Amino acid sequence: MQKVLAIVGPTAIGKTDLAISLAQKLNGEIISGDSMQVYQEVEVGTAKATKEEQAKVKHYLVDNRSVFDEYSVKDFVDEAKKAISEVAKKGKLPILVGGTGFYVNALLNEMQLGERNDEERGTSQKWEDYLKENGAEKLWQILNEKDPTAAAKIPVPNSRRTMRALTVIDRTGKKFSEQQKKIKPRYDYLIIGLNSDRQEIYRRINLRVDKMMGKGMLEEAKFIYDNRDKEHQILQAIAYKEFFPYFDGEKSLEDCVTQLKTASRRYAKRQLTYFRNQLPIQWFDPLNDLECEQKIINKVREWENG
């Protein structure tokens, strides 16, 4: 079974820097496991590796789609599988790096994602329309009635995951939680999780947002705002919709920046919750442990030789 190393963790923890360093030392190449970094038109808000960083180690699934393209988790899995095969053919180690837990899980494990077809799109649209009319709580209540086990694992505000579960239930006629139980590994994988003191992570998130504002964050958000009538996944990304009230003249820029920091901190918390509950992870602290990288390398070597 093909070996795949995965590096996961909350936003701003330092996944990119560590992954590049590990790839250089372990003869690896990087596959992005982030649902938003595939889009070409946005750089700052998606926290992609810079062009200089990408020049150090080859990256896959970065800048390979337009924000106007339809892109699902199945598309990601199909493309990532091809990337892993390509890396492996070179005799190198595929290193999956990302913060989108469901995407990472769907790639590393066999999951019944199904084909994207007109029926699926129609079912998904049904729940999107319901959400707009009734709100996240009522949407979640429907899932709770259909599949309490699945609902218990999905926070009420996380409408995207709720809609995904309802869509799968509609498409297959089976409970989402029962299908999750049938998961089996697609690869021989090792997942390295990065985490640290919560307040330090929050401080780094706030600092990152401030830096993003100096790199063109507002211009990217304006581009998304100007195209918001088109239905595309990037509208769900934290970093863009927080600025819409500013463009509408409803809030100050300062208030929107504060809202982005708050949303990013909440997202980091949700990321950690998913990783802890859904994936078998070896945890390390890159911010407080000076020997963190070497410990990870030792763990990877042990896994590679096992």
Swiss-Prot record:
Residue positions binding ATP: 9-16
Record site: Interaction with substrate tRNA: 100
Region (Interaction with substrate tRNA): 34-37
Required cofactor(s): Mg(2+)
EC id: 2.5.1.75
Keyword tRNA processing found: yes
Keywords, in A-Z order: ATP-binding, Magnesium, Nucleotide-binding, Transferase, tRNA processing
One of the protein's GO biological processes: tRNA modification
UniProt xrefs under SUPFAM superfamilies: P-loop containing nucleoside triphosphate hydrolases
Catalytic reaction(s) noted: adenosine(37) in tRNA + dimethylallyl diphosphate = N(6)-dimethylallyladenosine(37) in tRNA + diphosphate
Residue sites binding substrate per the record: 11-16
Family to which this protein belongs: Belongs to the IPP transferase family.
Job description of the protein: Catalyzes the transfer of a dimethylallyl group onto the adenine at position 37 in tRNAs that read codons beginning with uridine, leading to the formation of N6-(dimethylallyl)adenosine (i(6)A).
Oligomeric form and interacting partners: Monomer.
Protein's name in the database: tRNA dimethylallyltransferase
Biological source species: Lactobacillus acidophilus (strain ATCC 700396 / NCK56 / N2 / NCFM)
